[in-house]
Amino acid sequence: MEWWSDGEKMSMNHLTRRNKNRGYMKLEVWQKAIQLLGVIGNTLSQEARVDFKLRSQILDSAQSVSSNIAEGYCRRSVKEYIQFLYIGLASMGETMTRLIGLKTLHQITSQQFERIDALHYEIENKLLKLVEALEKKRDRGDWIDRLSEPKEETR
């Protein structure tokens, strides 16, 4: 599998090394969050007007999205998973607020902003849907909090 980041082909060989703990890598929302980080990083690297501290803060908040999706997934608890997804959503808000600031200060162009915003919006909606689905699973009791399959009852 390969992703495209600003026209640059990126190898995704790490996806061939699979186990249950790396299952988050199959989530489209995680893949898109990684893509967003790449798009933001490439955009900001082209703009000398953006100071280092602000660039670092934006990249940190953007990277926090995929990191929280992964950490929540790996916790195995639906309650913790949902909590980490909410943290990811908060990081989405922080990232967007900083990007709006850059646009307002004319440190990125409207075209650059729109490109990022479209991807950001898509990820935000996918995160919201994932939270809703997990909350339903939690409420129905359909979540298994263990790596191994539960043993079937013998009759």
Q: What kind of region is each of these model predictions?
A:
Residues M1-R155:
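Amphipathic alpha-helical assembly/interaction segments
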